[in-house]
A protein has these predicted regions:
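Acidic, low-complexity intrinsically disordered segments
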Residues: 2-29, 54-98
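Beta-strand elements of well-folded, non-transmembrane domains
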Residues: 32-51, 77
Length: 98
């Protein structure tokens, strides 16, 4: 079994955040390569947001929650696809604006 490292969660979160942008729904797939493993994320999710005014007066759109409708996380090595311990709850920790 492949153990998903925090560096992988961070890279997936950064890529996903860029793909989500300011949308309230995301449906798509993308791949990342990490060391000797190719990872493929498939996700359909509802994005809950709120606006917050910063001290300097600028308004920012922040993610409150992301609710997956469907998700898959595949890991492929030289030997083919292997099971992994990916946890969507852990990915959310990297995505949610605190």
């Amino acid at each position: 079994m492949y153990t998903v490292l925090s560096k992988v969660y961070l890279e997936v979160a950064e890529r996903l955040s860029a793909l989500i942008g300011t949308s309230q729904y995301y449906s798509g797939a993308f791949e990342i390569d990490f060391e000797d493993v190719s990872c493929r994320m498939v996700l359909s999710a509802v994005i809950y947001r709120h606006n917050e005014t910063l001290p300097e007066g600028r308004v920012v759109d922040l993610i409150d929650n992301i609710i997956p409708v469907w998700w898959e996380f595949h890991t492929i090595t030289e030997e083919g696809e292997v099971l992994n311990d990916f946890d969507f709850a852990e990915l959310k920790e990297y995505l949610l604006d605190k």
